[in-house]
Amino acid sequence: MARLSGVDLPREKRVEIALTYIFGIGRTRSRETLAATGVNPDTRVRDLSEDEIVRLREWIDANYRVEGDLNREIKQDIRRKMEIGCYQGLRHRRNLPVHGQRTHTNARTRKGPRRAIAGKKKAGKK
């Protein structure tokens, strides 16, 4: 089993797809990596030579931030926005959608389950 950036790649999948199991690498970056290292995208992970695995590992480490480094950078960016008090930071701080989505209805994923609010009481006759 090939191990790149701390992730075990599935042996039966094509390399082009298997690389997308690494956080920070999607289909496009996977294709770029394979083209730059000269590895055939249709090769199965189990058929990769040790030399190809080393080339892939070195290319990814040199050119992309992936896995833990990328996660850390994303968290730092969010924390920085919260500290400087920009609009996006305020939305993060209040656990509301950040990218301009409506919140009157919907946004349940971000806001969490509904909290029950006491309904209107009917006024009694005078």
From Swiss-Prot:
UniProt KW keywords: Ribonucleoprotein, Ribosomal protein, RNA-binding, rRNA-binding, tRNA-binding
Gene Ontology CC terms: cytosol; small ribosomal subunit
Single GO MF annotation: rRNA binding
Keyword field contains Ribosomal protein: yes
GO biological process per UniProt: translation
Region: Disordered, residue numbers: 96-126
PROSITE patterns: RIBOSOMAL_S13_1, RIBOSOMAL_S13_2
Family note: Belongs to the universal ribosomal protein uS13 family.
General function of this protein: Located at the top of the head of the 30S subunit, it contacts several helices of the 16S rRNA. In the 70S ribosome it contacts the 23S rRNA (bridge B1a) and protein L5 of the 50S subunit (bridge B1b), connecting the 2 subunits; these bridges are implicated in subunit movement. Contacts the tRNAs in the A and P-sites.
Subunit structure: Part of the 30S ribosomal subunit. Forms a loose heterodimer with protein S19. Forms two bridges to the 50S subunit in the 70S ribosome.
Name of the protein this chain belongs to: Small ribosomal subunit protein uS13
Record organism: Frankia alni (strain DSM 45986 / CECT 9034 / ACN14a)
Recorded name of the encoding gene: rpsM
